[in-house]
Amino acid sequence: IHYSQNLWTWCANNKVAFFYASSAATYGDGEHGYDDVSIDNLRPLNGYGYSKHFFDQWALRQVAENKPMPSAWAGFKFFNVYGPNEYHKERMASVAFHSFNQFKETGTVKLFKSHKEGFDDGMQLRDFVYVKDAAAAVVHFLTAALSGKPCSNGLYNIGTGKARAFKDLATN
């Protein structure tokens, strides 16, 4: 997170806007909801989520302590972004991408096994957001900042607001 902190500090010192990719992974299993009102209660499930979470906490501390801030700033908590041309991501490509290719090759989609009581295989929920919709949200913030009328600073969820089961994705 040190590089991100250095970028923030440079932007603050030079009155430049700072927009960064956080992640919905900061919410962990969703037990504490999907907002940042109680950010210190969030428990990411992996190192990636924690790295994003630590920087989000650090940014909010800068604000709370009235430290220098960029001219405008936002952390975008992207949910499950999918879209064309994900080939270069290999195994890190979206579930939607892998499911589509699996269906194209075999005519079926193998659903994730559930390891949680009460969830059948494939019934795990995710908020799938198309890459062009995610990009439009970021462009909105950039355009507002460039126009001199930036949006409110803070952390923003970038998703549809509706979770879908993997099974639903695979059958529709």
Q: Model regions: which residues?
A:
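Residue-level detector of conserved, well-ordered beta-strand and adjacent loop positions
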Residues: 35, 112, 159
